[in-house]
Amino acid sequence: MLDGALYLCSFGFLYLLKLDELKPEFIEKPLKMLKNGLKYLKENRLIVHLIFLHAFVGITAYDALIALLADYKYANLLSTSLVIGLLNASRSISLMFAPALLSKFMNKKTLIYIYIGQGLGIIIWALSLRNFYLSLIGIIFAGFCTSSLWSYTYTLLQQNCQKEFYGRVIAYNDMIFLGFSALISFAIGFLYELGLSVEMIAAFMGSLFFVGAFYYHVVSKRYEIR
C-alpha cells in the first residue's frame, strides 16, 4: 500500500512538472542514432574503456552470495530474511558514510588505490565469513569503496563524452554494467555448484578488482583522461 501511494505521488509530481521550455537539440531517427552511437564508440576507444572500468563495480552485486550465506552457511543461526537484512544493513553503513571520507582524496591519480581498496575490502569480508557476527563487520569493509568507485568512474565517463552522444553512451554503459552484474550473479551460483566455498568465491571476486586497478593503470597511461 505504501509503495503504491508513493508511486501515485511521484506520478502526480511528474504530471505537474512543466517542461515546455525543454526542447531536444539533436533529433535523429532511432536506427541512425544507434548507428552513430556505435560509430562514436568505435572512434573513441577511451569511452569504451571507461565503460568497462565502470562495469567492474558490477562485481559488488553479490546479492546471490548473501543469499547463499543466508540459506546454507548461517541457516542455523537466524532466519533467512533476518540474515539478509542484517548483512545489507551493515553494508549500507559504509555505502552511506564512506564517500564523505573518501571524497577528499578522490582524483584520477588515486583512483587506482580505490580499486585496490575495494578488492582488499571484499577479501577482508571473505576472511570474516566463518563467523556471522564478524561478517557483519567485514561487509562494512567490502562496501567502503563501492559508492566512491561507482560515482567517480561514472563522472569520468560523463566528462570525457561529447554532449550529443551523452544519452546513448550512458545507455550503453548501463547495459554493460547490468549485464556484468548478471554475469557475476550467474558465476557465483556456478562456482558454488562446482564445490567452491563462499569464502573462496568472495576472495575471487575481490581479486578481480586488482585486475581492474591494473586495467585503469594501462588506460590512464595510454589515454589522456579529462
Q: Model segments located where?
A:
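Helix-loop junctions at membrane interfaces in 12-TM secondary transporters
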Residues: 126-139
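Substrate-agnostic recognition of the 12-TM MFS/MFS-like secondary transporter fold
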Residues: 6, 58-63, 94-95, 99, ...
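A single, central transmembrane helix in multi-pass transporters
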Residues: 1, 39-96
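Hydrophobic alpha-helical transmembrane segments
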Residues: 1-20, 82-85, 89-90, 94, ...
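Helix-to-coil boundary motifs at intracellular loop junctions of multi-pass secondary transporters
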Residues: 69-76, 156-160, 194
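Juxtamembrane intracellular "pre-TM" segments in multi-pass secondary transporters
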Residues: 19-51
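Structural signature of the two symmetry-related core transmembrane helices
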Residues: 4, 110-124, 203-207
